[in-house]
Regions:
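Bacterial N-terminal signal peptides
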Residues: 7-18
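Positively charged n-region of N-terminal signal peptides that target proteins for export
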Residues: 1-6
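Predominantly soluble domains enriched in secretory-pathway, periplasmic, or organellar proteins
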Residues: 21-463
Length: 463
């Protein structure tokens, strides 16, 4: 068994004492997506760190609806990702399946949407449980929206699904920030899975009939469509910026020429894709943009969940050079055959560590980047359990961590999680605050959505 640091009762006690006076400077809030609960939860970070508020919802200051209610009063939306604007005045929220009622839409392949929200109103308790913070909503340009990057003039939105199916996407949309218009769309080439793929032109040429694709994973006919999940921007030594996508359908990572995409060119992949252990989901660039970390979440072809993250070199990937995957690190489990289902990643600001949420094994890994690049089997330097309180129905359910973020000083990681319950169930999700120095959970916020996904940290408030 590898030697790693785990949270002990002693560490927990010390960590609670350590946060008696929170280290955060200025006001800070966590903005967490409620997912099946179509609201964004604003959590006062300092309040969450106060011991009396631990394992309660007391630090939640407001919950903002991501869509206007349906005419019959039913809440709508499916918030899975959230990214702030440069001035932190606006939050862009990805609704994976758009303005759906989660009690009615019970499949993949809903049309994605983007909610544009006023951050000040999101933090105002007077607007709790209203849509007052919602400024506008627009179509994301395809189905199963998930990844989001905010650029000066456009949003980049990746799509992992096709109409009413889990397979069949090769699209990343470019959405005008001011108008919501779709200004362009990246079209990714199909894969080569070893079985026949649809005769589908890339770029698309009309008229072409819709392709026949698998309805639901796992299915051995997956592998033709990349189905891009989260996306990230890397910096090449040539001075150019490259777009990376984790492709759940083809078990690999694409590298694309961002400048050409912004000029309206639809096909912009510049090199062969980089294979990873299995279908990726979360992907993030290092602070200097030279490395890309990506999770191996699950296979779409067979019943298999991954247990590694990959660290990819931007320059080697963009040039198609061998060894672009610099390191592959097992996380969440000591068993080489164990399935930890790593979900998302976040880098510390100094680029020395990577935080990984392991959904299946209910823990959070800390990966030492220097050790990983040296192929040290001890690169996973900490593994921190995340647990939940008993639910109102008397059942203690697993943590199922998903979203990750790190404070700008590198002191804390925040992680969202919780199982998917019936949409009518009381808010049951959890946000954990982890002290990265103590390697321990130091605060637990309960009652955060239903199956929460992405989250972000707002420090020092909007400009």
């Amino acid at each position: 068994m590898r030697t790693i640091v785990v949270a002990s009762w002693t560490a927990l006690l010390l960590s609670f004492l350590a946060v008696a006076e929170p280290a955060l400077a200025g006001d800070a809030f966590i903005l967490a997506t409620g997912r099946r609960d179509p609201r964004i939860y604003a959590i006062d970070f300092k309040a969450a760190l106060r011991t009396p508020n631990d394992r309660t919802p007391n630090a939640i200051v407001s919950r903002s609806k991501v869509q206007a209610d349906r005419l019959d009063g039913t809440p709508l939306g499916d918030p899975a990702n959230i990214v702030l604007s440069e001035d932190r005045r606006t939050a862009y929220v990805i609704n994976h399946h758009g303005a759906v009622n989660n009690a009615e839409f019970l499949q993949h392949g809903g049309r994605g949407s983007v909610s544009v929200m006023n951050v000040r109103k999101m933090l105002d308790p007077r607007f709790d449980n209203t849509d007052a913070a919602l400024e506008r909503s627009y179509d994301s340009g395809y189905f199963g929206a998930v990844g989001l990057l905010v650029l000066p003039e456009v949003l980049l939105v990746s799509h992992s699904e096709n109409w009413l199916t889990e397979d069949g996407s090769n699209r990343i949309s470019l959405i005008d920030r001011k108008t919501g218009s779709r200004r362009g769309q990246i079209e990714m080439v199909l894969g080569h899975p070893g079985h026949a793929c649809p005769d589908f032109p890339v770029p698309f040429v009309s008229p072409t009939p819709p392709p026949v694709v698998p309805f639901l994973a796992s299915d051995p006919q997956f592998g033709c469509w990349p189905n891009p999940e989260f996306i990230a921007l890397g910096n090449g030594s040539d001075g150019k910026t490259y777009l990376f996508s984790g492709n759940a359908g083809t078990d690999d990572v694409s590298v694309m020429d961002l400048k050409r995409a912004l000029a309206g060119v639809p096909v912009v992949e510049v090199a062969p894709r980089v294979p990873v252990q299995t279908g990726p989901f979360g992907i993030k660039a290092s602070p200097n943009g030279k490395l890309i970390a990506v999770t191996a979440r699950e296979s779409a072809k067979v019943d298999f969940e991954g247990n590694t993250i990959s660290i990819i070199d931007v320059d080697r990937a963009r040039t198609g050079s061998p060894g672009a995957e610099l390191a592959r690190v097992r996380v969440g489990t000591d068993d080489p055959a164990g399935e930890s289902r790593p979900f998302t990643v976040a880098w510390t600001p100094d680029g020395r560590e990577i935080v990984v949420a392991n959904y299946r094994t209910n823990n959070v890994s800390i990966v030492d980047v220097r050790r990983a690049l040296a192929h040290d089997p001890r690169a996973e330097v900490a593994r921190i359990p995340v647990t939940r309180l008993i639910d109102p129905d008397g059942i203690v359910r697993p943590g199922n961590p998903k979203g990750t973020a790190v404070t700008s000083d590198g002191r804390y990681a925040v992680v969202s999680g919780g199982p998917r319950l019936d949409p009518t169930a009381p808010p049951s999700g959890t946000v954990w605050v982890i002290d990265l120095h103590m390697r321990a959970v130091v605060a637990t916020v309960t009652g955060v959505g239903n199956d929460p996904y992405g989250l972000t940290i707002l420090e020092d408030g909007p400009d």
